[in-house]
């Protein structure tokens, strides 16, 4: 049986003890699941730059360059942020679901700081944005009864599996902003949103597995 080749993209430079435990437990289990793996870890203060750096981008390589300059063979990229806390089985479930459903972009869920909403927008509701200045993020209640994967407008890069061929379909820089430009409003999108909308234009939609919810470690200031 051929091994599945996964490159783990880990943007950041500060990794907590909880992340270290999660990561160590995961890499210990990978060989048992017939997975050949590698890691790409980069840091930059600019989120767009660090995502492209994790993919081996070259600032003078031109728009037609491919991830890792086409020199690295892989089947999937797994993006994990430095503040995620997870169990190995959550990754294996994500990978298996992507294979079973032939899904090119698949993510689990994680709460954003504040703990009330996930880093996921299902509907690109422009009218909601015009009134509020942000899009409506999913809540735990929104997904409490959902068991099957479903398509979303965009989700965070924090726990994201991407099949080979997606980034390869895009011009460099592979991760770049797009714009909301309508009715006098002009705003730049986030890294995840820009990438996923450009990928969708190439036929690669983004899906969520609502049964996979990982931890998101954030500091809290306690005060009276």
Q: For each predicted feature, which ranges?
A:
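Short, conserved alpha-helix that lines the donor NDP-sugar binding/gating region
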Residues: 44-70, 196-197
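Anion (oxyanion) recognition and catalysis
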Residues: 31, 99, 200
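Short, high-confidence coil segments that cap the C-terminus of an alpha-helix
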Residues: 74, 102-103, 204
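N-proximal low-complexity "stem/linker" segments adjacent to membrane-targeting elements
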Residues: 1-45
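C-terminal catalytic/acceptor-binding lobe
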Residues: 169-224
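Polar low-complexity intrinsically disordered regions
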Residues: 11, 83, 95-97
